[in-house]
Amino acid sequence: MKIRSQVGMVLNLDKCIGCHTCSVTCKNVWTSREGMEYAWFNDVESKPGVGFPNDWENQEKWKGGWIRKINGKLQPRIGNRALLLGKIFANPHLPGIDDYYEPFDYDYQNLHTAPESKHQPIARPRSLITGQRMDKITSGPNWEEILGGEFEKRAKDQNFENMQKAMYGQFENTFMMYLPRLCEHCLNPACVATCPSGAIYKREEDGIVLIDQDKCRGWRMCITGCPYKKIYFNWKSGKSEKCIFCYPRIEAGQPTVCSETCVGRIRYLGVLLYDADAIESAASTENEKDLYQRQLDVFLDPNDPAVIEQALKDGVPQSVIDAAQQSPVYKMAMDWKLALPLHPEYRTLPMVWYVPPLSPIQSAADAGELGSNGILPDVDSLRIPVQYLANLLTAGDTQPVLLALKRMLAMRHYKRAETVDGKVDTRALEEVGLSEAQAQEMYRYLAIANYEDRFVVPSSHRELARDAFPEKSGCGFTFGDGCHGSDTKFNLFNSRRIDAVDVTSKTEPHA
């Protein structure tokens, strides 16, 4: 057993209001640069829908993640080394700019410089890649916001598999949920395995997956290999970039920017201890529906004396073990079984987990629109189909989803009896196997969600690292070229990258 630590995240979809604050703050901090205009390390999708980039969950098309061979070994879905190298100069499974969207801005300067005319001057959209005027904006980073567009296009959502999706196109049966997405920082990352340059690595101390910008040669195999499509190609620098889990903040014991600025308090950060030697066998599980439980088996109890002893021997600091014992991620994933992984069938063992949404369910239950199954309402007839959530979070296995939903309903039933009726009613808790102490703690973490409860991040031990003070307020991702550009000779053809076009001051001559 080799014990390692990882900073994981849980997102409570029951409380997400779809405000996109996380996306905007992440964009302003990390991807507001030339070449990354189209990239969103964090985005919030409306489900059902094909998402961003288009149809990212269709692995038959994009070949992301892992597959299990007949002999029980894992192999990237894109192919073995020979097949991967055979596609290195022409990858047919690579998303194009149209699968994301062509980034654009508006020539606002025209509003000030337009000559006098009988028509109101307007700011026309222009491409941030070519600088040319765009006749029509056909896509964007949030094109399906709040079920935008016709159901025929949204029905291509891969999570409708094994469902009669036609009925959900009717207005009476419409449902919606928000899904914030970022890099999963997987335990078994396919992007690391598919990079020909060996530029992607997973940090031992906190599990964050990063791309070495000096080693990256822009082959873009990692974009295909990542089943979540959370790696982006910077057309300015010629290198791939991805969510870095705000590791400078994590090292200082602070939460990520998306977590810090979340309006709904839906994000939780905490340390998980895991057995690194068990990753291969867990990811190689034959039945996809067993992958969720096998990943749970990889995680270790931070309160177990034997685990603590072995962790210290393996170099895990005591402060990290102490943080793991207070981790909200461990409580929600292991103790209460509320948090579930996103598409475990990709076999990457993702480390950003989700609590399934309950809000529309609760309103229907309160109105008496749901049948009752004992004390709790019948969660098999909810507005958001359980099978849809299962396809999204547990490879189609409905039992973990049902347990999570029932436990959240039971906690609400218990607290309502306590605060409204003034009595203790534990019947709902007994039905789902929860104690009163667990229900009270769940209420504190889910409803109150204090800062110190949501974020338990130990500062890193980098006593021997060089002083980073000279880098403060500097320009990142410029490869030593100062703050005036990102030109670099670190590319295949040793050529100068094109400059981005400033479209805000570019105007058309008037007739």
Place the predicted regions along the sequence by residue.
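Non-ligating segments of multi-cofactor redox enzymes
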Residues: M1-A511
